[in-house]
C-alpha cells in the first residue's frame, strides 16, 4: 500500500480550497506546500519510529482515537487555535522536529511562494492528515508498535520517489536530522502525490 497516496486521499479538494481561502493563497500554492509537507512529516515518523517505535505508535494512536480525520477543518481555521479537541498537532510536530520546525516552515514557504503563516497552516493540515491516516491503517490492520515501525520503514522507497520537483528534500532531511534516512534510497524528485 502506498501510504503517500492514502494520506492524500483524505485531503478532499474542498479542504484545500478552504485552506487557500482562509490563508489568502492560491489553491495551487497550498497544494504545493502539502505535496512537500506530507513526505517530510512521513520522513519524521519513519526516522523516529526506528528509535522510538512505542512513542510513534502512541502518537498515531492518539490521532486515530481523537478522530482527527473528521476534524481537519478545525486545523485550518485561522480564528481558532491549531488544535482539534485534545489533539494538538503542534505539540506533535515539535516532538518530531524539535527546534528545526520553524526552519521547515520557512523552507515550505519559500518553496511554494506563500506566507510563512500559510505554510504553517498547510503543514498542520498535512501533519494531522498524515498521523490520522497512519493511525487508521494501524488500527485497521491490528498493528502493534513493532508492526507499525516495520510498515513505516517499508515506505522509504515510495517516499524517496514522491518529493515534488524543486523542493530540496535531501538538504531539508539533513537540516532536520533525517539525512541518514535515505542513505540507501537516493531521492528522485517528481510530482506523483495525488493531491486534487
Language model features with spans:
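A structural "flexibility-hinge" signal
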Residues: 1-196
